[in-house]
Amino acid sequence: MNKFSKHFLSVLMSFAIYSGLAQTHKLEKLWETDTIVRVPESVLPDFKKGILYVSEIDGNPNAVDGKGGVAKITVDGKIIDLDFTTGLNAPKGLGRFGNELYAADLSEVAVIDINTGKIKSKIAVDSAKALNDITVDAKGIVYVSDSKTKKIHRIENGKVSTFLTNVAGVNGLKAVGDELFILGGQKFMKADSRGNLTQIAMLSCGGDGLEPVGNGDFLITCWAGHIFYVTADGKIETLLDTQEKKVNTADLAYDNIKHILYVPTFWGNKVMAYKLITTK
């Protein structure tokens, strides 16, 4: 066998191996709640207790009206308490550190006792207009996005500072290790501890929520009704498109052990669960 034939055979075998390893993904619907969850925007899980915390806007997403709150449901969709926390305005993103639950509430971050649902305190974010998503890193540092001012704020020991500015369309955040993964408009990016940005992928719509799969890949939602699987190197696979049905897909949660997505439907007034199925 000459050198050319050997090289060609090697390339052919490599392609066959790669093709065999290539994976595709799909979603299988598991359940949905009744349409009684009042404009759910974000889901935060406590898998040890089998609980999902759900932010409820309950009305105008920009109104300072005191109607918003946090609900509790089980991981199989049963309602525990629609009024676990009350007295918020238009809460969106949720985060947790220890026994404290954090809720992005327009111009403030509400700190909630996760055992009682009572609001312990509120952290004012100066100049904030539309606080949206929240994530908390392993050290307890809180990051919160402001979609109107294009800023990402950092809260450490109750003190607020600005981490990033001019992030157009900023919404979803997720702290993973020393990196902060960010959805800004159609861009999926990550920032290092100094705020240096690296673009990972360009979506077809404005990103809302994001959750790591556990292998470097991410699940990403667009509010209008799209769920994507995005690989670590930026390849995008569409898992769900409910835009024509006018079923929103807001800030999701993901169980990377059972491979289940929990998706709030905003104006749909319910939470839906899907199984992520991986095939080769």
What are these regions (language model features)?
Residues 73-77, 113-118, 155-159, 191-196, ...:
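Short loop/turn segments that connect beta-strands within beta-propeller blades
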Residues 27, 108-139, 144-145:
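Asp-box/WD-like beta-propeller blade repeats and closely related beta-sheet repeat scaffolds
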Residues 1-27:
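Bacterial Sec-dependent N-terminal signal peptides
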Residues 54-76:
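Beta-propeller domains
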Residues 27-34, 78-85, 118-124, 159-165, ...:
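A short beta-strand motif characteristic of beta-propeller blades
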Residues 251-280:
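Blade-level signature of beta-propeller repeat domains, shared across WD40, Kelch, NHL, RCC1
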Residues 37-49, 66-67, 85-100, 126-142, ...:
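Beta-rich, blade/repeat-based domains predominating
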Residues 58-62, 108, 149-150, 187-189, ...:
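Short glycine/acidic-enriched loop and turn motifs that connect beta-strands
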